[in-house]
Amino acid sequence: MRIAVIGAGKWGSALHLALKENHNCFISSLHQRDLEDFVSIKEALECEYLIFALSSQGMRVWLKENFINKGQKILIASKGIEDQSCQFLDEIFLDFVPKENFCVLSGPSFAAEVMQKLPTALMISGINQELCKKFASFFPDFIKTYIDNDVRGAEICGAYKNVLAIASGISDGLKLGNNARAALISRGLIEMHRFGKFFGTKEETFLGLSGAGDLFLTATSVLSRNYRVGLKLAQNQKLDSILAELNEVAEGVKTAYAIEKLAKMKGIYTPIVNEVVAIFKGKSVQEATQNLLKQND
């Protein structure tokens, strides 16, 4: 049995390091990397189990350019919504593999802490529960895995919390205090759940590891690149320069636009996301924050 992680960024590297403890695990990306166990894309695609840790915005292009055997088993470890199509990652993968052959990984997990082998709990969601259990068995003892079948709920939580982390970073960057941040995060959880209900998700998903757990982590720590984007926006830095300086993908930026578009199409009330997008488009962080503080729900 061989496993390949597709994507050699921080998260992909952390997953590879964890999985190689007990299994024959390789890592691959579009560009050659000087990494232990690095293999070409062609070699990676010969593995039975694939774990995708690519940018959500680049996922479709990668899948179109590289042939995946429909019998291969896939774990989607990326978190985001495609901006152009407003499609969730499972919808993108359905164009290439049957839904019984993939699962979604979610939950509170900073790559740096996984690489340090610190205790971590993750959720694996899929309609094929046996496949979920199989992927769960790959992880070492310091990573506790749970399984469920709410794929869409896990995806919405993983994507939405990145946008809320930007909002939280803005609040902290403006030095509005712990009370304001707590209010923002709790209202953000309600907003995220309201959005998810439209897609038939389970309420417990939003209260568990995938939702509240990942949100509380991502929206309160400088280890979160999305939170750091918010901090810098509060300092009146331009988004383009922030992203260039970050030199990493902050999934919450593109995801915010996708959620805003989806919410408008479906008639879902998403005030926090709307204000974050307005800031991206030039609205002052002070005005946007004041608007949020005045909201009644």
From Swiss-Prot:
Catalyzes the reduction of the glycolytic intermediate dihydroxyacetone phosphate (DHAP) to sn-glycerol 3-phosphate (G3P), the key precursor for phospholipid synthesis. NADPH binds at residues 11, 33, 79, 111, 225, 249, 251. It is found in: Cytoplasm. This is Glycerol-3-phosphate dehydrogenase [NAD(P)+]. It comes from the Bacteria. Sn-glycerol 3-phosphate binds at residues 79, 107, 109, 161, 214, 224-226. It comes from Campylobacter jejuni subsp. jejuni serotype O:23/36 (strain 81-176). It is an enzyme of class 1 (oxidoreductase). GO terms for biological process: carbohydrate metabolic process; glycerol-3-phosphate biosynthetic process; glycerol-3-phosphate catabolic process; glycerophospholipid metabolic process; phospholipid biosynthetic process. The lineage of its organism: Bacteria, Pseudomonadati, Campylobacterota, Epsilonproteobacteria, Campylobacterales. PROSITE patterns: NAD_G3PDH. The active site is at 161 (proton acceptor). It catalyses: sn-glycerol 3-phosphate + NAD(+) = dihydroxyacetone phosphate + NADH + H(+); sn-glycerol 3-phosphate + NADP(+) = dihydroxyacetone phosphate + NADPH + H(+). PANTHER family: GLYCEROL-3-PHOSPHATE DEHYDROGENASE, GLYCEROL-3-PHOSPHATE DEHYDROGENASE [NAD(+)] 2, CHLOROPLASTIC. It holds the Pfam family NAD_Gly3P_dh_C.
